[in-house]
């Protein structure tokens, strides 16, 4: 017999189950992704996990699709599948529902960095940043991209005023008139819920490292430099540097001199 459980209660039960087995950053990743599921459940009027079906999970996938890169969608759905399987084991959803979650198929070259960044590697990068580059621009950029799955162009277009620390939101907006358009225009405008850990990081970045220099349109970019808004190529270079194993592990996987 199924036990009536709200989506938030189910997520908290799942987090309690994994928090002693997985790294803190991995647990934070799972919590963030499942907050998106809770948000969708609220909008869809789902207040009991007993009513979750394969069709409803497909509706969630459709809701999430188009707002994030395919690799990010796959990460979100993988976490959702693990969560739903936990719910099956705890008599919260009907048996077999988890198997109905279809993950997108990745083709070679679809990921932004040409190589798939695994959760374990991302956890290593975040641990490195927490110790040695806390709240720097590079740390902030990577943490936002990894936890939200937004495109780098959307991140570049964020202003300081788009960050709502009180409600834990980042507001993504299409602003072509001031050189920060979104790839899919108004269709992908949205407010992204972020975890408390990321809220604190952004606040610390703004307090400790942000230059507070306006761009050519009088806007103050969230990801800013002393010259104003960061160029897309500079943003990508920061990501590339941080995700190189020789940077965050101090070891080269190809046995090269790490100074090269």
Residue ranges and their predicted role:
Residues 119-152, 217:
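Basic, Lys/Arg- and aromatic-enriched nucleic-acid-binding interface segment
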Residues 30, 76, 137-138, 231, ...:
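Hydrophobic (often cysteine-bearing) scaffold residues that line and stabilize catalytic clefts
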Residues 107-124, 180-196, 213-218:
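DNA breakage-rejoining catalytic core of tyrosine-based enzymes
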Residues 27, 80, 141-142, 149-158:
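Alpha-helix N-cap/helix-start motif at helix boundaries, enriched for small hydrophobics
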Residues 9-112:
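N-terminal core-binding DNA-recognition domain of tyrosine recombinases/integrases
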Residues 157-201:
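Conserved tyrosine-mediated DNA breakage-rejoining catalytic core shared by Y-recombinases
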Residues 197-259:
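Active-site/catalytic core of tyrosine-dependent DNA strand-transfer enzymes
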């Amino acid at each position: 017999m199924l036990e009536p459980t709200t989506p938030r209660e189910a997520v908290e039960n799942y987090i309690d189950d994994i928090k002693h087995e997985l790294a803190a950053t991995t647990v934070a990743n799972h919590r963030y992704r499942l907050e998106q599921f809770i948000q969708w459940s609220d909008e869809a009027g789902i207040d009991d996990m007993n009513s979750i079906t394969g069709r409803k999970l497909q509706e969630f996938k459709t809701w999430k699709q188009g707002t994030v890169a395919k690799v990010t969608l796959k990460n979100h759905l993988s976490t959702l599948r693990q969560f739903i399987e936990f719910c099956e084991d705890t008599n919260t959803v009907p048996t077999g529902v988890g198997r109905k979650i279809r993950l997108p198929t990745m083709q070679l070259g679809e990921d932004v960095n040409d190589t798939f960044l695994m959760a374990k590697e991302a956890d290593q990068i975040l641990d490195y940043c927490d110790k040695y580059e806390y709240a720097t621009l590079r740390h902030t950029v990577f943490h936002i991209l990894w936890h939200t799955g937004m495109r780098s162009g959307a991140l570049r277009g964020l202003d300081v005023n788009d960050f709502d620390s009180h409600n834990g939101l980042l507001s993504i907006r299409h602003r072509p008139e001031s050189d920060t358009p979104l790839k899919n225009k108004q269709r992908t405008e949205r407010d992204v819920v972020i975890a408390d850990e990321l809220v604190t990081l952004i606040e610390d970045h703004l307090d400790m490292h942000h230059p507070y220099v306006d761009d050519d349109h009088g806007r103050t970019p969230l990801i800013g430099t002393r010259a104003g808004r960061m160029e897309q190529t500079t943003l990508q270079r920061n990501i590339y540097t941080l995700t190189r194993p020789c940077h965050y592990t101090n070891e080269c996987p190809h046995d090269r001199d790490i100074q090269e």
